[in-house]
């Protein structure tokens, strides 16, 4: 009973999590022109405009494989698709951060976007706040237009999410900055120097470190050389850390910090130490539909694309090959130092069945296998090593068309074939079934000399001529001009072999030429017999007189 209740409770939580307006976690599966495709594990993937993933500088903040929070606009819209919004999720997260900053009296970063009656509007990561003119500075300022477009620190002094009302103060920040400790820290800050601080706050994009009255931003991309999904993987609130000052804008009191810069960049000599085609051992750190990520060095992850996982199955799911945490051997296929990307291959560390086949088989060798599939263009036969060879329609039979011959076979049949060609690079093997027997056309040409009289059966006839079949299924043709009488399908005719068209594999025949040759031979035979007869003188003279000699 308790298990049933627990199950119902779990299902109710899932329903709540997928209600319209809820925030869900999704994975970036593709970045297309104008849209980012996100899979949140719902009914369908959702296309979100790229504009919702751009930062203030107009730069794309994500890449394929990243996990992002998105708001559920609709579980199913009018087209049966899930509709997600990154913009609403960012706004939701911003409200949470604003509430936290308000409670802890922490500073927030915002952009003074415009001037309104009584003050300015400030953009706080998707949330619009109001900055009263009296709270712009510690001293009354008649003209503060020079602040427009500037990114500054503020303190939240009023917050009402229901009414979408946020009031901030720049003066409060300035007043808190006017301390002796702060001045001392600012005086000693130098780009490139190492300083100590305490982690004050964590956000999705990084951590704020208190350097002693001055907050510095340790961005998530500067925490480690490897990919970091969330700052909590590296630091936690209250941690004392040593960081490097990357940038220091004294006028704006902006400090950018780095943690990974304290160590050596693992990408610095990666191409030299691990060139293309070299092999390494690494650990599987992430699985996606398009491949898996393998950490080959501390801080260096490479992608094994799904097409580089198995020699014979190009579309196999990565989870069928490796598991999270597996130690695997990979080969370096490509290195892009500028973009800090490395392409790896799993299958390249295993024997290549295509190369093995090429090494052990020559043109003309006989192979046997079962038919795996039959297509419009031929028959695929399974060979050793899990690879396939193709028998093209034109290589099935000498005597009948491929379309007719292929009907004699079915999936699962065991057949023999001859190796015609092997291309291990393109992973192609050409096979032939008809090559198991001698070519009847070539045999005919070799056995019969031009001028020989052969027997043929009429298979087609029209006004232009007759198509005939010779011994062994060889195709012949007799033009109507070379026929002495009408013929019908099934008639057997004797004809003279007059020529051959090797390209079309047709033997040309002539009944008329055969008959003419026979008549000429008969006349010659009669003349020869007449010359052999001895005629008496009287009769001879009479014979000559009759002939007018």
From Swiss-Prot:
MF (Gene Ontology): mRNA binding; structural constituent of ribosome
Pfam families in the cross-refs: S1 (PF00575)
InterPro entries listed in its UniProt record: NA-bd_OB-fold, Ribos_protein_bS1-like, Ribosomal_bS1, Ribosomal_protein_S1-like, S1_domain
Database matches in SMART domains: S1 (SM00316)
Residue ranges constituting the S1 motif domain according to the UniProt record: 21-87, 105-171, 192-260, 277-347, 364-434, 451-512
Source superkingdom: Bacteria
Transmembrane stretches, start-end: none
Listed GO biological process terms: translation
SUPFAM superfamilies, A to Z: Nucleic acid-binding proteins
Claim: RNA-binding is one of the keywords in the record: yes
Recorded GO CC terms: cytosolic small ribosomal subunit
Keywords: Repeat, Ribonucleoprotein, Ribosomal protein, RNA-binding
Residue ranges of coiled coil: none
Entry similarity comment: Belongs to the bacterial ribosomal protein bS1 family.
Job description of the protein: Binds mRNA; thus facilitating recognition of the initiation point. It is needed to translate mRNA with a short Shine-Dalgarno (SD) purine-rich sequence.
PANTHER family to which the protein is assigned, alphabetical: 30S RIBOSOMAL PROTEIN S1, SMALL RIBOSOMAL SUBUNIT PROTEIN BS1C
Protein name (database record): Small ribosomal subunit protein bS1
The encoding gene: rpsA
């Amino acid at each position: 009973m308790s298990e049933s209740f627990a199950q119902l409770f779990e299902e109710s939580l899932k329903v709540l999590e997928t209600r319209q307006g809820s925030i869900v976690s999704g994975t970036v599966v593709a970045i297309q022109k104008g849209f980012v495709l996100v899979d949140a594990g719902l009914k369908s993937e959702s296309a979100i405009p790229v504009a919702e993933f751009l930062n203030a500088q107009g730069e794309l903040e994500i890449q394929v494989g990243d996990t992002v929070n998105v708001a559920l606009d609709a579980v199913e819209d009018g087209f049966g698709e899930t509709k997600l919004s990154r913009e609403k999720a960012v706004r939701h997260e911003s409200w949470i951060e604003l509430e936290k900053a308000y409670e802890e009296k922490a500073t927030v970063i915002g952009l003074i976007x415009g001037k309104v009656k009584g003050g300015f509007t400030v953009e706080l990561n998707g949330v619009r706040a109001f900055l009263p003119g009296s709270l712009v500075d510690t001293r009354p300022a008649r003209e503060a237009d020079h602040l427009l477009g500037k990114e500054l620190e503020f303190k939240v002094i009023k917050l009402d999410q229901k009414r979408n009302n946020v009031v901030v103060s720049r003066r409060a920040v300035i007043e808190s900055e006017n301390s002796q400790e702060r001045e001392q820290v600012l005086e000693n800050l130098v780009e490139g120097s190492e300083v100590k601080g305490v982690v004050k706050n964590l956000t999705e994009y990084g951590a704020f470190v208190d350097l002693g009255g001055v907050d510095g931003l340790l961005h998530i991309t500067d925490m480690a050389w490897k990919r970091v999904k969330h700052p909590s993987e590296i630091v936690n609130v209250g941690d004392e850390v040593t960081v490097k000052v990357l940038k220091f804008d004294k006028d704006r009191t902006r400090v950018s910090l780095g943690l990974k810069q304290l160590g050596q960049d693992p990408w610095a000599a990666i191409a030299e130490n691990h060139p293309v085609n070299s092999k390494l051992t690494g650990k599987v750190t992430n699985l996606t539909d398009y491949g898996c990520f393998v950490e080959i060095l501390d801080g260096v992850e490479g992608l094994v694309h799904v097409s580089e996982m198995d020699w014979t199955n190009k579309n196999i799911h990565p989870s069928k090959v490796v598991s999270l945490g597996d130690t695997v051997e990979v080969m370096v296929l490509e290195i892009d130092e500028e973009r800090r990307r490395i392409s790896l291959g799993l299958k390249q560390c295993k024997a290549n069945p295509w190369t093995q086949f090429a090494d052990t088989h020559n043109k003309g060798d006989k192979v046997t296998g079962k038919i795996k599939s039959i297509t419009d263009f031929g028959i695929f036969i399974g060979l050793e090593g899990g690879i396939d060879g193709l028998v093209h329609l034109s290589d099935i039979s000498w005597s009948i068309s491929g379309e007719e011959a292929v009907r004699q076979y079915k999936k699962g049949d065991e057949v023999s074939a001859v190796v015609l060609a092997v291309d291990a690079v393109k992973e192609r093997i050409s096979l032939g079934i008809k090559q198991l027997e001698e070519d009847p056309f070539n045999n005919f040409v070799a056995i019969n000399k031009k001028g020989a009289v052969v027997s043929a059966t009429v298979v087609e006839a029209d006004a232009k001529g007759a198509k005939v079949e010779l011994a062994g299924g060889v195709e012949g043709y007799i033009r109507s001009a070379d026929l002495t009488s009408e013929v019908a399908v099934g008639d057997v005719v004797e004809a003279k072999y007059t020529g051959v068209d090797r390209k079309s594999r047709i033997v040309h025949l002539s009944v008329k030429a055969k008959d003419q040759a026979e008549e000429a031979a008969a006349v010659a035979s009669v003349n020869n017999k007449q010359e052999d007869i001895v005629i008496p003188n009287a009769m001879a003279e009479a014979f000559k007189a009759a002939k007018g000699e």
